Amino acid sequence: MIWTAGVKPNLSYLENDEITKKFGRILVNNNLQIVNHKNCFAIGDISIIEGMEDLPITAQVAMQEGNHLANNLELLIQEKDPLPFEFQDNGEMISLGIGEASISGLGFTLSGKLAFEARRLIYASKLPDITESLKSASSWIFQKKSIFKKFLK
């Protein structure tokens, strides 16, 4: 397993390795298997999928790859063929400073304070544990400057 964070992975430790690289990232097939190493996988910023070189280097892609890889590993354990990865574009979210954000995708665009709060809740929903999700969401909702404060009076 290789862990990487950020948008430019450090592959210097693989210089003498037989792992194929492209654009400074590990080349994987559409099952997320490292090319020529069928029992090794790479996902996220460190990898690039053959035929999908234009995928953005974002958390959205990495999270979808992670979920897909987990499902494929389960299939492989059951001695079934892995399925090819298919990216589903769910839009983009960006913070624009304290209390401001923009969300676009799924046919709409939202910006400002409401987008800021929605973005926070979406991130909270992605936390791995429901308890942590609820703690994060409730702390944000009950903050002094939260737009939800108006609705809770």
What are these regions (language model features)?
Residues 1-67, 71:
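FAD-site-proximal beta/loop scaffold in flavoenzymes
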Residues 71-153:
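C-terminal, flexible cofactor-proximal segment of oxidoreductases
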